[in-house]
């Protein structure tokens, strides 16, 4: 049986990896614990719509805005 949450989780993990963002970086950006982000990526938790739309933006700009935001907030 096709499991939508697992497929979605794999897709968002691939987006994060392609943008060369770590779990910790992206968790910080989203304001969630790294364990929560891992649960999204494994399909154990449903991804909130707001976070899912952010993944689309990350895919479109290859994580540039996220990296910029992280650098501004860690400086």
Segments from the language model and where they lie:
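A short, Lys/Arg-rich alpha-helix, primarily the initiator
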Residues: 1-18
């Amino acid at each position: 049986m096709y499991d939508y949450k697992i497929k979605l989780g794999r897709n968002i993990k691939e987006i994060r990896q392609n943008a060369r963002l770590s779990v910790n970086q992206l968790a910080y950006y989203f304001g969630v614990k790294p364990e929560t982000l891992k649960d999204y990526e494994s399909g154990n938790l449903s991804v909130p719509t707001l976070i899912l739309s952010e993944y689309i933006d990350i895919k479109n700009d290859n994580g540039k805005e996220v990296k910029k935001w992280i650098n501004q907030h860690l400086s």
